[in-house]
Regions:
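Extended active-site neighborhood of metal-dependent phosphoesterases/phosphodiesterases
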Residues: 1-97, 119-141, 152-186
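Short active-site segment of divalent metal-dependent hydrolases/proteases
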Residues: 22, 109, 149
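Active-site glycine-centered loops adjacent to acidic/histidine catalytic or metal-binding residues
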Residues: 19-20, 106, 145-146
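Flexible loop residues that form catalytic
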Residues: 108, 147, 166
Length: 187
């Protein structure tokens, strides 16, 4: 991957977001599962500014409780850890409320059909509004993927989610990939 990026996309600046296939399943703890990723690509959560916009990258892939060596990448909680949420709140203290904020996590905040958030926040059942309230007063665009669908959701006037689907489109279940054309379901 790094060789391809360094040779093919070397003139682009890339910002990585950890997803459900980016963990090392042979080890035990969640932090250890993400160690190769954080040592080679990017921190699991971080922020940066480009122009007059603030970008926040969060990790909501929690593999806590998955035994070492058990490669079941579909068994995880959609969870923001307590330390990550504390960091997020501290980060936002340094961002003027008039600054546009873009937040990204691999998992979306709700499913394509609009049903609620089935994840956890700080290891407990989460209320989506509790997470969104952290960004009160900011104009936020939440960017997500994972679903293999493309959809947009407005949670309130200042918090909107754009789910981009997956770059692999539907080949993973259809077994069909049109050369040069990758299509994800819209809606």
């Amino acid at each position: 991957y790094k060789n391809t990026i360094n040779s093919t996309l070397r003139n682009l600046t890339l910002f990585h977001t950890m997803g459900n296939h980016d963990n090392e399943m042979e080890v035990g703890e969640d932090w250890a599962k993400s160690l190769k990723y954080t040592q080679n690509l990017a921190p699991d959560y971080y922020s940066f500014n480009i122009g007059k916009c603030h970008y926040i990258v969060l990790d909501n892939m929690d593999y806590e409780g998955i035994a070492a060596g058990h490669d079941n990448r579909s068994k995880y909680a959609r969870n923001y850890t307590a330390s990550q949420l504390a960091w997020l709140k501290k980060d936002l203290e340094h961002v003027d409320k008039s600054t546009p904020v873009f937040v990204t996590s691999h998992e979306p905040l709700s499913s394509p059909d609009g049903t609620g958030w089935d994840g956890e926040l700080n290891g407990k059942d989460a209320d989506l509004n509790e997470f969104i309230s952290i960004f009160e007063g900011y104009d936020v665009r939440f960017l997500s993927g994972h679903t293999h669908n493309i959809y947009h959701r407005t949670y309130n006037q200042n918090f909107k989610e754009h789910n981009s689907g997956a770059v692999c489109a539907s080949w993973w279940w259809s077994g069909y990939m049109t050369p040069g054309v990758h299509i994800a379901q819209d809606g």
